[in-house]
Curated annotation (Swiss-Prot):
Protein name: Ribosome maturation factor RimM
Entry note about domains: The PRC barrel domain binds ribosomal protein uS19.
Principal location listed in the UniProt entry: cytoplasm
Record's keyword annotation contains Chaperone: yes
Source organism (scientific name): Marinobacter nauticus (strain ATCC 700491 / DSM 11845 / VT8)
Subunit-level organization: Binds ribosomal protein uS19.
Single GO MF descriptor: ribosome binding
Pfam families recorded: PRC (PF05239), RimM (PF01782)
Subcellular location: Cytoplasm
Taxonomic lineage: Bacteria, Pseudomonadati, Pseudomonadota, Gammaproteobacteria, Pseudomonadales
PANTHER family in the cross-refs: RIBOSOME MATURATION FACTOR RIMM
Name of the gene this protein is made from: rimM
SUPFAM superfamilies xref list: PRC-barrel domain, Translation proteins
Amino acid sequence: MTQNSQETVIGRITSVFGVKGWLKVFSYTDPKDGILNYRDWTLLLDGKRIPIRLEEGRRQGQGIVVRLKGIDDREVARTYCGAEIRVPTEQLPELPEGEFYWHQLEGLDVFTVEGECLGKVHHLLETGSNDVLVVHATAGSIDQRERLIPYLPDQVVQQVDLKGSRMVVDWDPEF
C-alpha cells in the first residue's frame, strides 16, 4: 500500500472478468480479500480521480473480482483497467504498537546502528518468508547503492521513528 496525502492505495484494477462488467483486482491488503471491506473507492486513472462504490466482490481462484456501481458492461469495465484503488487513510484499521503499514515505512531514512546513512525506503517487496525493504541511496548516504534489507523487527530493524522519519537497522553496509 502506498499513501498519497490523505489517501492510501489498496489495490489496482487489472482486467475485466466475464461479460457483465465485473473486474479483476490485485489487492495490496493483507489478507487479500480485505479490500472488500472498503465500499467507497477513489480510482486514479490517467491523472483523473473517479469516486465509485463497490457493490459486491468475492475471491475468485487466487484473486479478487468486483462489481462496481453503475458498471454492467464489459467494454465500459475495460476503461477502468489499470486504475489505482484508493481509500481515505483514516479508514484503515489502527495497528497494534510496533506494527506499521508499508506506506508508513516508505520514505523513511535508513541508518545503521553505527549511524551510517544507507538511504531512504523506496518501497517494500513481499517475498513469502519476510518482507524486504528496498532502500535507495540519497545525497547523504554512504554510497550510491540500492540495498535490499529484510524487514525483520528486533532482528534487523531495531527502531522505527515515524515522527523523526527514520529507521535504524542492524545491517552491514557491505551487503
